[in-house]
Amino acid sequence: MFSPPSLLHITMTTEKIDNISVTTQANVYFDGKCVSHGITFADGTKKSVGVVLPSTLTFNTGAPEIMECVAGSCEYKLAGTDAWIKSAPGEKFSVPGNSSFDIRVGEAYHYICHFG
């Protein structure tokens, strides 16, 4: 069942993540327009931190994701919707599992992707 997008407003972006293991080899997608590194917490929780450079891209999801903007901004559109929604620093948006979303970036968009 499709859940409508949720936009969570918070007052502060995540600036630092402690006590993690970092995958040193970058994940490079879309000819370098998106670059990320995987991180793993002591409890096994996985996230990725990265940047999307100016472009319009489509990402597919396996697990549900929460995208947290830490710098820059983007507009996103979830699969099955027509509206572009802006996400700025300190904001998050949710993407269902086994779905996709379009992202439109005019300036470098720095993010944390929370899986599951």
Whereabouts are the PLM-identified features?
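Short alpha-helix capping/helix-loop boundary micro-motifs
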Residues: N60-G62, L78-T81
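Short beta-strand segments in beta-sandwich/barrel cores
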Residues: L57, G72-K77, K92
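Short, conserved beta-strand element in jelly-roll/cupin
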Residues: G62-E75
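Conserved short histidine dyad/triad with adjacent acidic residue
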Residues: F41-G62, S94-G97
